[in-house]
A protein has these predicted regions:
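Surface-exposed, beta-sheet-biased, low-hydrophobicity segments with strongly acidic/polar composition
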Residues: 1-223
Length: 223
């Protein structure tokens, strides 16, 4: 995660992480995604003398992001990382091959469960009261975090940026396929069952009354 005053974020302009040498664009053209770029700065003085400075090459980010998805228990609760979309049961049945996680909220006496993201293939102990649509059966690896307030997702005062290299470095060996007791400013690293995507899911807010949770996602294409 980048913590650097040299990093800047400007709306509709690229942000450059000097530490990692990654151009992080708000909107990345598909043709440029994952490639590299060299920057050349030139100036001409009043006497005609010229000077130029070349920087790079820098890698263009291979990430996408989606903000403020509202997951609601037993409604829009089926999350697809490929689509970065939440589906209800009918939508999940139609897109079964894309469903990676189920959101649920449970208040269980003697157990700290609350807001959870659970793989469809997890033990039924972590899916109480859930009847999965036909074909929804993936096992998604997860690693819970706390206070990793990525600026793009949290939009708080913190100068932390989850970048491409962070997704590459995460070790999912022996990772569980569920996370429970999620709270605002918590999050989870995620790897899809086919290994195609990794993602960071940030929890913006939770609401016990409406059994809902608002999340924002950064997704990284691995292969």
């Amino acid at each position: 995660m980048v913590k650097s005053l040299s990093e800047f974020q400007l709306r509709k302009r690229p942000s450059w992480s000097k530490k990692w040498g990654v151009l992080n664009l708000s909107t990345v053209p598909e043709a440029a995604r994952g490639k590299s770029v060299t920057l050349k700065f030139s100036a001409t003085a009043s006497n005609g003398q010229t000077v130029s400075y070349i920087m790079g090459p820098y890698s263009i980010t291979n990430m996408d992001r989606k903000l403020d998805l509202v997951a609601t228990d037993n409604k829009a609760c089926y999350l697809s990382i490929a689509d970065m979309t939440l589906y209800d049961a009918a939508g999940a049945a139609t897109n079964a091959a894309k469903i990676d996680l189920v959101y649920l909220y449970r208040s269980i006496a003697g157990i700290t469960f609350a807001h959870a993201l659970v793989s469809p293939a997890a033990s039924v102990d972590y899916l109480p009261g859930i009847t999965l649509p036909s074909g929804v059966n993936k096992s998604t690896k997860m690693s819970k975090t706390w206070a990793l307030n990525d600026f793009n997702l949290a939009r708080l005062q913190y100068g932390i940026y989850v970048d491409d290299v962070d997704f590459q470095a995460i070790d999912f060996t022996n990772a569980p396929n569920f996370v429970i007791n999620l709270k605002a400013q918590a999050g989870s690293w995620v790897e899809t069952a086919d290994g195609k995507y990794r993602a960071y899911i940030y929890v913006n807010s939770v609401n016990n009354t409406t059994s809902s949770m608002t999340v924002s996602i950064k997704r990284y294409l691995m292969k």
